């Protein structure tokens, strides 16, 4: 399931503490501290204009990953990013979470389109999006991440 992240949740995660009523993955981190700090900044920036902007991915009361709106939405389009702890990959957690995010988006009148990008080598992430009805719309080269595949799913 996805649960909206609030600033105190990020504060807890940055301290290595489980937020609210969930447990931390014990055998691997959901994200390195620098990634958590970056996601916290993104959530604050995006959240000033659009909320919710970040969610915990929770399975069996354990926070296994995160999903975020990573750019300020424009014209009904939200751009998402997501990740799951390495020890919880390959179990369908991300596929279920992105499916739930799409249900939320389709019930939010502010959202008409959800976009995401995956590395060309990240087959697992590509499958997550395909299983949730995303359509490959092109490719681009990112200065930091290299070749990326661009995806979109209608939210109306």
Map each language-model feature to its residues.
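Conserved acetyl-CoA-binding loop-helix of GNAT-fold acetyltransferases
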Residues: 82-84, 90-105, 127-131
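Residues that form or flank phosphate/diphosphate-binding pockets in enzymes
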Residues: 92, 124, 146
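A local structural micro-motif
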Residues: 96, 113-114, 137
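Proline- and acidic/polar-enriched loop/turn elements at helix boundaries
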Residues: 100, 117-118, 141
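Conserved GNAT acetyl-CoA-binding A-motif
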Residues: 107-117
